[in-house]
């Protein structure tokens, strides 16, 4: 038996209903905030993520699915959506669009991680990106959008954690403080973080190794090294969130796992998910557009994991069932009755009615059992006598009442099965 690759999922109708609810609510919420949808290629040039996400990140060093195509070009299955969105804006000449430019996407991403509950190698994200607005009100707007969606979906006990990781002006002093702190404890660091100590000490704060995490808790905090501009930006963000009535906590451990972030970073935590409790994460990336060859243009956005959102909804007691019960099932006996039944159900389908009939040459008893299993609201038995009279009995499956109907009056039949 051929099995699916590790870390991927098969999603059947009873769970797809959660995906559909999330996607529908995400689109409606994004539209309320003025965001339009963008669709991006699954494959990108590897250089995009090396330059955009950062060479020293776990994503680039350990997690990307990268290969050479037949032309010898290095391609990568996208591990996230922000870099591709920026690339699309630059490549298609959209930097001169009216600002702020607001875009959202729903897409699958790929990372070679250890699969566990809420963490997959192919995972889906709803993400938003806003370009051209440098102030904290833009940050608060993006956070508000995420907050609104999570509450619309019924996720309980959500908490918002915010931090500022500074900008290129103030980050060197912070990097120096981190390097000094971790150098004294280098022997305790994992081999990967010992290398990060020289290349990018900020990434040590994002390490999942227990010893490194414990050391990171006592490390210097970013908010103690902010320049006046970043301090003012963070203070403005807090005032905006207060004005919007959005509760938050300051978490100096949030640095996010991608190098393009500047100033504001944030996460929404849903404890009902379990160990992988971050259901949304994002921040500001004011230098990414220029880094990838475009003009200087500030950006702010987030990614929300759909797989984890489903766990959060289910853990919060949100129960959804597929709305796929047929309004009518026609049980037919004989070739002529089968053909007539096919014509009736197709006419009803043209009217937007979910109707079914037998396709497997079942006995009448087996057909009625199948109709009950489908949860059909009404059934109609069609045989030689019904064909001869041109009428049949329509049975309401909930109360067993029966009504005579004309086989030629599709409008009347439609009216009865949609009452």
Go through the PLM ranges and name each one.
Residues 1-365, 370-412, 416-419:
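TRNA-recognition modules of translation machinery and tRNA-sensing kinases, especially anticodon-binding
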């Amino acid at each position: 038996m051929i099995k699916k690759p590790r870390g991927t999922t098969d999603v059947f109708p009873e769970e797809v209903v959660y995906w559909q609810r999330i996607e529908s609510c995400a689109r409606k919420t994004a539209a309320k905030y003025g965001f339009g949808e963008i669709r991006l290629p699954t494959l990108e040039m590897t250089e995009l993520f090396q330059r955009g996400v950062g060479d020293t990140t776990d994503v680039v060093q350990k997690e990307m699915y990268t290969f050479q195509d037949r032309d010898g070009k290095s391609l990568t299955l996208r591990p996230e959506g922000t870099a591709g969105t920026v690339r699309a804006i630059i490549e298609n000449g959209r930097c001169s669009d009216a600002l702020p430019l607001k875009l959202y996407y729903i897409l699958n991403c790929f990372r070679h991680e250890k699969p566990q509950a809420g963490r997959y190698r192919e995972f889906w994200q709803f993400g938003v990106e806003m370009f051209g607005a440098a102030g904290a009100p833009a940050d608060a707007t993006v956070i508000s959008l995420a907050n609104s969606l999570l509450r619309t979906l019924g996720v309980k006990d959500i908490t918002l954690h915010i931090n500022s990781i500074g900008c290129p002006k103030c980050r060197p002093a912070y990097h120096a403080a981190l390097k000094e702190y971790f150098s004294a404890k280098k022997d305790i660091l994992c081999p990967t973080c010992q290398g990060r100590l020289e290349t990018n000490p900020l990434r040590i704060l994002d390490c999942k190794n227990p010893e490194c995490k414990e050391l990171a808790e006592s490390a210097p905090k970013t908010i103690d090294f902010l320049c006046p501009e970043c301090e003012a930006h963070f203070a403005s963000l807090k005032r905006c969130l207060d004005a919007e009535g959005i509760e938050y906590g300051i978490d100096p451990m949030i640095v996010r796992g991608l190098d393009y972030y500047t100033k504001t970073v944030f996460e929404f935590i849903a404890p009902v998910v379990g160990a992988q409790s971050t259901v949304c994460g994002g921040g500001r990336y004011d230098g990414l557009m220029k880094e990838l060859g475009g003009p200087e243009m500030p950006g702010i956005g987030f990614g929300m994991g759909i797989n984890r959102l489903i766990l959060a909804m289910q853990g919060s007691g949100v129960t959804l069932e597929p709305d796929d019960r047929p309004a009518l099932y026609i049980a037919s006996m004989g070739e002529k009755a089968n053909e007539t039944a096919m014509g009736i159900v197709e006419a009803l389908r043209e009217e937007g009615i979910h109707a079914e009939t037998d396709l497997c040459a079942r006995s009448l008893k087996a057909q009625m059992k199948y109709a009950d299993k489908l949860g059909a609201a009404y059934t109609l038995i069609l045989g030689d006598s019904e064909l001869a009279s041109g009428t049949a009995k329509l049975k309401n499956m909930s109360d067993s009442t029966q009504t005579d109907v004309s086989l030629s009056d599709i409008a009347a039949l439609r009216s009865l099965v949609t009452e």
